Amino acid sequence: MRIKKIFITTTFDCNLRCKYCFEHNKTNLYIDVNKMQAILQKEFCDSGSYDLFSITFHGGEPFLAFEEIKKICEWTWKNYSNYNILFAATTNGTITNENIKTWLRQHKKHFNIILSIDGKKEYHNLNRGKSFDMIDFDFFLSTYSRPWVKMTVTPNTVEHMYENFIYLQQLGFNTNPTLACEIDWNEKTDLYKIKKELYKLVQYYISNPTERPGDLLSLPIEKLITNKDIYTTRCSLGSGYVAFDVLGNQYPCQNFIADFSKPYSAESINECVNLINQNDYRKITEICINCVIKEVCSPCYGLNYSNRASMGSVDKVWCYITKVLVYFNAYLIIKALTNGKQYIWLKDKSQIEIATLATAAKEIINLKNQLL
């Protein structure tokens, strides 16, 4: 399926001030509906034969601009009913009043929600203010079938990652634990805690074959084999991705918009796009050339650019974290392929793909001393 992914920043404003948020210098700018409708019209006309348009609203907190979202969605459904279009929003879930709830219920087949909840109340509130009790859990769980939750893990909650994951799973959410980016991880003490929690997550997925692993444990480790001596860019940016800020400025993806105070530079963004289109990671992240997992790793060019002014300026601690993640991905594959259970996330793979995964996993396990 060919998917066009469009990311729209509805506002630079947010009602929360999460400690780990990498979107800096929030302002009360909001999206212009007419301008965004014109942008979407062009995207639909120019995008060719895509099977699906996936349009995701970001913020800030996107539902601060609910009326704008509503107008854009209803205009799109009216004028492009012959297109397969799915909307979504990533939200903290704290401002969904009855008006928003009614609208979401009416359009739940065409408008998905990704909630930001970090686990139990005591751990969620550590980084997200006293916002836990502001979320209507019953509404989201009754409206959507196992709604997705992005559970952000930070140094002050990492040793409770598995505990918080299980808590949200048992509530009925589909939980995706992620490690916070662009914050101060300690490469010794925090890495040790990450390893312990990842081991528990692996055991969970091994014991629950109908559950699909989240982002931390679904890295494409087969690329260690399939991308050997291939130097394509390690990010999936390309013609299938585009992002727009509240002013309608275009970016390769939403992570290029992390600093809301930074003035837009079309020249700088065009340079990034041209470099990405050359499709050779060596021209972007030279530091990766001799890395043993370079085929698997996907450094975030957007966060590098928005936080350190260069797509090739990587967060060194994140390199250590990624090596740990790759190892535990391989460990999960080895366990899954040797215990005789049928895993939902493996059943659609061919025998050749399974064999490639197994080979890659074994090679990675043999690199244990370099990764851990």
Where are these regions (language model features)?
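Short, small/polar residue-rich loop motifs at catalytic or cofactor-binding pockets
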Residues: 235-238
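C-terminal accessory region of radical SAM enzymes
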Residues: 196-226, 250, 254-299, 335
